A protein has these predicted regions:
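Active-site catalytic motif of lipid deacylating hydrolases and related acyltransferases
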Residues: 1-37, 157, 179-180
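Gly/Ala-rich beta-loop-alpha elbow adjacent to hydrolase catalytic centers
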Residues: 44-53
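Active-site charged/polar residues at nucleotide-handling catalytic sites that mediate phosphoryl
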Residues: 38, 60
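Short, highly selective alpha-helical patches that border small-molecule cofactor pockets
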Residues: 1-2, 6, 53, 139-142
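The alpha/beta-hydrolase serine catalytic core
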Residues: 63-169, 173-175
Length: 254
């Protein structure tokens, strides 16, 4: 898939296809660091990569194309405990991977919160592409609980080079055209206040990610909040919703 994407976009766009760490939180942190550094226009992931991309998209503010997303990696891994080989060559030459109970538990912890940062603003900015002959992941119904746009292709779980070029690439091109990179991000608090996202930064003592944001009312004060708290949902009076919901640029500062 990686080589097909690079070939299809050669001379038009840079395609970054790093080997991901086996452990999911480490993989999330690894991809997040690349996003911070490279400022991509679009995330594309397949299977477990799509599982990770879905969690990152609304947080980093980048649309995502999810190919055959596997939202229950624990179900996939449990019957496969033991030593395996990566299917695609790894840049470090290490083709060995070991699935353990501890690894499965790491995935379980992320599965439990994987949709916590979903927001209405991204309901049409995360697209799903599902293989009609996929025998491994069948999660379109779950996808449609959170997102609105799905497509299908006559292939299996792992797309061939030809399928990537015929289906993934045209959808990626369409997303790049429909959702140009945003230079600024705005959010509305559930109590009504409007804010502008400034940046994500690390707490120097705890290494926790925090969001710096500015009020667009009153004295236009700057605020800092843990990133997880900024993006996650809250429950009030039996209703669950985003604490801060991304929106387009406000027409005024109220």
């Amino acid at each position: 898939m990686a080589s097909a994407l690079k070939e299809a976009f050669a001379g038009r766009a840079e395609v970054l296809t790093p080997d991901l760490p086996l452990h999911p939180q480490e993989a999330l942190n690894f991809v997040r660091a690349i996003i911070d550094r490279e400022k991509p226009d679009l995330l594309i992931g397949n299977s477990c990569g799509a599982f990770l991309a879905q969690m990152l998209a609304p947080v980093v503010g980048v649309p995502a194309l999810l190919g055959n997303p596997h939202f229950k990696m624990t179900d996939f891994l449990k019957p496969r405990i033991g030593e395996h080989q990566y299917k695609a060559p790894r840049s470090d030459g290490n083709q060995r991977l070991v699935i353990t109970e501890a690894l499965i538990q790491e995935f379980a912890e992320l599965e439990a919160t994987q949709f916590d940062c979903c927001t209405p603003y991204y309901s049409n900015r995360v697209w799903g592409l599902f293989g009609e002959h996929d025998t491994i992941a069948h999660f379109e119904p779950i996808f449609l609980e959170h997102y609105t746009t799905t497509h299908h292709f006559p292939g299996g779980h792992t797309p061939t080079e030809q399928e990537v070029k015929a289906w993934y690439v045209p959808l990626a091109e369409k997303m790049l055209a429909e959702f140009p990179k945003k230079s600024e991000r705005y959010f509305r608090h559930f109590k009504g206040g409007m804010y502008q996202y400034v940046l994500s930064a690390f707490d120097s003592e705890t290494q926790e990610r925090k969001v710096v944001y500015q009020a667009l009312y009153g004295e236009r004060a700057f605020w800092v909040r843990p990133e997880k708290m900024f993006f996650e949902k809250v429950t009030r009076d039996g209703k669950t919703f985003n604490r801060l919901t991304e929106t387009d640029m406000p027409s005024n500062n109220q």
